[in-house]
Each structure stands twice: as C-alpha cells, then as structure tokens.
Amino acid sequence: MAQELMFEEPRRGKPPRHLADFDAEGRASAVAALGLPPFRAKQLAHQYYGRLIADPRQMTDLPAAVREQIAETMFPNLLTAAREVTCDAGQTRKTLWRATDGVTLESVLMRYPQRNTVCISSQAGCGMACPFCATGQGGLTRNLSTAEILEQVRAAAAALRDEFGDRLSNVVFMGMGEPLANYARVLAAVRRITEPPPMGFGISARSVTVSTVGLAPAIRKLADERLGVTLALSLHAPDDELRDTLVPVNNRWKISEALEAAHYYAEVTGRRVSVEYALIREVNDQPWRADLLGKRLHRALGPLVHVNLIPLNPTPGSDWDASPKPVEREFVKRVRAQGVSCTVRDTRGREISAACGQLAAEGG
C-alpha cells in the first residue's frame, strides 16, 4: 500500500531550546534573562560558531561560576552519536544521531581532494513517500529544530578540524527529510551556516545546496529570500504519468509548475539549478525519456540547469535496480544533445547505506 504524503509533522514535544535556535536578538534576550552582561551573547556565539565548542564547561573565557548555568539553559545536549560507520578508505562517514526524545536521524561526512561536504537531515524521516527512497518509505516522525540541523554542521566541522586539520567547505540538505517542508527552521539554519562568525559558520552560500522534490510555492519563496544557495530539484521523471508514481508530490504540483518555480529561482538568484535524476532500470531510463528530459529542461531553464544522474542506490525490500552502464551513457548523451549539461554523480557511501535515498536511521 502506498504511503500518504505528509506535509505537517505529527504532534509531539519540541526539543529544548539551544543557543543555535536564537538569532542575535534572541541570544541577547537569553543572556539578559540569566542576568549576564550583553557582551556574553556575542562571546557565546563566537565559541559555538567560531570555535565549534558546544559545551560551556570548555569555554574558559566564561567565569567558572556561570558555566554550569549556561550549559543547563542554553546548551542542552541535543544530539548524541549512537553509531558511526565509515567506507571509501575512511573518506565517508555516516553518523546515526539520537535526539533528546529518542528520535534518530543521520548525517554523512564526505572528504574529497578539493572539498569537504556534510550531507545533513532537516527532518526525522520524510513525508514525501517516494517509493525508491528508504527515508520516504519510513514516513515522517517530526521536523528537526534549527539547532538540531546546525549541530550536524558543527559536529562535522569540528571532526574535520580535530581529526584531519581541515575545514568544512560544503553543506548539502540532502539527508533525511524534505527541507522545504520544514521551511522556517531550514531557512534559519541556512542563514546561520552562511553568516560569518560570530553570527554563523561562515560557509559560502554558493557552497550550500537545498534540495526539494518540487514544492513549487516554497521554491518561489526561497528565491525571494535572495540567499544565493544552490537549488537542487529532485525530478526523477520528465513526464507526469511516471512522476506521479515516483515522486507523489507531483500529484499536487506537476512538472510544469516545478520547472516554472525553478526558472523563477534561477532568474531571481542568477544561480544554476541542479536537477537530480535517479536512473532506474527499465523504469525511467528509456531513450525517449532522456530526449524529453533534455527538451523540457532546455525550454524551461536554458543554460541555467545541470542534470545530476544518480545510479539508483539499493534499498531494503525494493525490486528496482540501477540502469546498466551502456544505458546510463546513452541517457547522458541524449540529454546533452538537447543542449543541457549532464553528468553522472560520484556515488559515495553505498556499502554503508549512506548514499542518496538510503538513509533510514535504523539501529543504534
């Protein structure tokens, strides 16, 4: 039986408030409520975003007498690493996190020669019900708070610095969940990821990618924020008949609406849109679908689009499989023939279920 779409999270308790949930005004108010001088707000933000410290007991520039109080009121331990697994000769690491209410989620840290990327979750589970995705099949548990999202980024940045003497360069909202279904918290997280310390982590907006299955009104809204992040549209089919099944949100917003919203995003931001297409053997890999994909994208976005073909990653209980390499090569050739840039994504983490569509937060 097909999963139902879920745009609203089930009602459940909220995570405790954390420094990372607050903007500058909120931090000032929280510090004032503790009876501390205003400069402590900036000091705490610098420790968290600049020095990547999440435990006030390690903040030696704070008076010892207030560290415990600050720890209890502004730095709850939101996420605990329940399990870590690695592959790709240690270059890919998947972390299973457990939140304070027992909810689990996953993030993936990937090291490349020229960049370091963390793939983060915006929801525990996902309500978009895509049948080829392990996360979507599990349903939506709840939205993550802004701080829970940012803690995944801070932990990755701290691990890179402490273990490898390196810096985090890229953040992709391609883990568990539909980012634009948790719009306000994801937006706040993006702002803090891109603002320079002490207001944020100082990662270039051009190095932040927000993916979506095609929530057209939210794509337009994100464009109007003018943040300059990369938009990744998970399309997976060029025709509504197939996409209605592969990406059920297509029953709400058709391909034409998603592409019109993507065009608006490209027009407003000047940024090229990335289109994600999981290539599934004998499902969406036919030559005519490659031709149609190229034509529709060229018509809608011109040069402001790039197609990432993703060989389907296996998920438990699924009979679907990745397309053979010759089919993949022909698909790329046909999309390019329509004047659209197209490459096959380097898939990392498949053997530890850390690749696209495999995150399910099981075990731990």
Swiss-Prot record:
SUPFAM superfamilies on file: Radical SAM enzymes
Disulfide bonds: 119-356
GO molecular function: 4 iron, 4 sulfur cluster binding; metal ion binding; rRNA (adenine(2503)-C2-)-methyltransferase activity; rRNA binding; tRNA (adenine(37)-C2)-methyltransferase activity; tRNA binding
GO cellular component: cytoplasm
Domain of life: Bacteria
Binding site for [4Fe-4S] cluster: 126, 130, 133
Catalytic activity entry: adenosine(2503) in 23S rRNA + 2 reduced [2Fe-2S]-[ferredoxin] + 2 S-adenosyl-L-methionine = 2-methyladenosine(2503) in 23S rRNA + 5'-deoxyadenosine + L-methionine + 2 oxidized [2Fe-2S]-[ferredoxin] + S-adenosyl-L-homocysteine; adenosine(37) in tRNA + 2 reduced [2Fe-2S]-[ferredoxin] + 2 S-adenosyl-L-methionine = 2-methyladenosine(37) in tRNA + 5'-deoxyadenosine + L-methionine + 2 oxidized [2Fe-2S]-[ferredoxin] + S-adenosyl-L-homocysteine
Active site: 106 (proton acceptor), 356 (s-methylcysteine intermediate)
PROSITE patterns listed in its UniProt record: RADICAL_SAM (PS51918)
GO BP of this protein: rRNA base methylation; tRNA methylation
Residues engaged in binding S-adenosyl-L-methionine: 177-178, 211, 234-236, 313
Any single Pfam family the record assigns to this protein: Radical_SAM
HAMAP family, sorted: RNA_methyltr_RlmN
NCBIfam families: rRNA_mod_RlmN (TIGR00048)
Misc: Reaction proceeds by a ping-pong mechanism involving intermediate methylation of a conserved cysteine residue.
Protein name per the record: Probable dual-specificity RNA methyltransferase RlmN
Protein source organism: Mycobacterium marinum (strain ATCC BAA-535 / M)
Lineage of origin: Bacteria, Bacillati, Actinomycetota, Actinomycetes, Mycobacteriales
